[in-house]
Amino acid sequence: MSMLLWVGEQKRPLTVDRKSDLVMDSVINYYGDEKPRLAYDPKKLFLDNGAFTANMQGLRLKAERVMQIQETLLPDKTIPLDFPFRAGMPTKQMKNRWQKTRANIIVWQDSTKLGKRLVPALHAWNKKSLENNVRWLQKHVDSDFLALGSLVSARFAEFGGFFGDRTPTRDLIDMLSLAIKSVQQNSDFRVHLMGFGSSPLMLHLGYYLGVASTDSSGYRRKAAYGKIILPGMGERYVGDGSATFGCQRNFFDGQRESDLSMWEKCGCQVCITNKDLIMTDWKARAIHNEFVMKEEAKVAQALTSAGLQAYETYLNNQVFANSSLKFIWEYAKLRRKYPRISEVLFR
């Protein structure tokens, strides 16, 4: 079974030639354009509807406009306009927003030319609604994927979604394993998890837990803040001290020999031709980071094809052996092998 990684791209692309890439973009990047058009040429395009970003920023998207942009760009996959939850919402409001999400799924499926390109979003406010909502999607939606949306746990107020560069927690692992298990038991959908390809550690955690598809825009954000991604590891800072999130210690200040050795072996275009650009040019760092994440996805594909045990052995010995997130990896293995449906997880 193929493991998909969609590379995040924008109106001002890192590179125009994307003919060999699966690309993730967002409606919100084209919302104000009179004539939306792509500035790059992708192999395949997954167009997010922008609802998560709008929800976080308190914006309201018009269904007709979202639909118009999607039909104009005609992506290979896209998400009907959905209504994510926000922290502090009462259950009644969450239920109402799910009903609006359901209604839009039907409209998009029956009244647009997007047809089988649709990837419905799954939202749930407790264990029972998770199971029921998966079953509803299975019955009414003609798609091979669904996208995990708002999953309301007891820690929902502290969790903003799967985007960005958040450090994974046991609660997140619980939430994902529960949702993935429910999807597997109640449908034949494959799971897309938004924004989980920000680092090798996150990417492998997602794939190991059963995610079949994810995307990465974090490679660009990390690069802009002076960070590079090392194969099989996490981010390392090579900038001038202006980082505002994640690892901020300079890579060359007492770095481990293994880190430097891993970087020296990098086969990306920048590292082969001129490594010095990594220190001075964010685009060079972005090219490097994108290359690393694509290579990690290839490793995951090869190992999962050989069987779960082969993948687990690799993660044990290579990716998480010396990682500060090893405790999360050990917890993920427990949840993968001994899945539980916890009443405590959902309120």
Predicted feature locations:
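Conserved, mostly hydrophobic/aromatic
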Residues: 48, 70, 120, 205-206, ...
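Short secondary-structure boundary segments
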Residues: 49, 82, 150, 217-218
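C-terminal helical cap(s) of enzyme catalytic domains, especially alpha/beta-barrels
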Residues: 162-165, 224-246, 286-301, 345
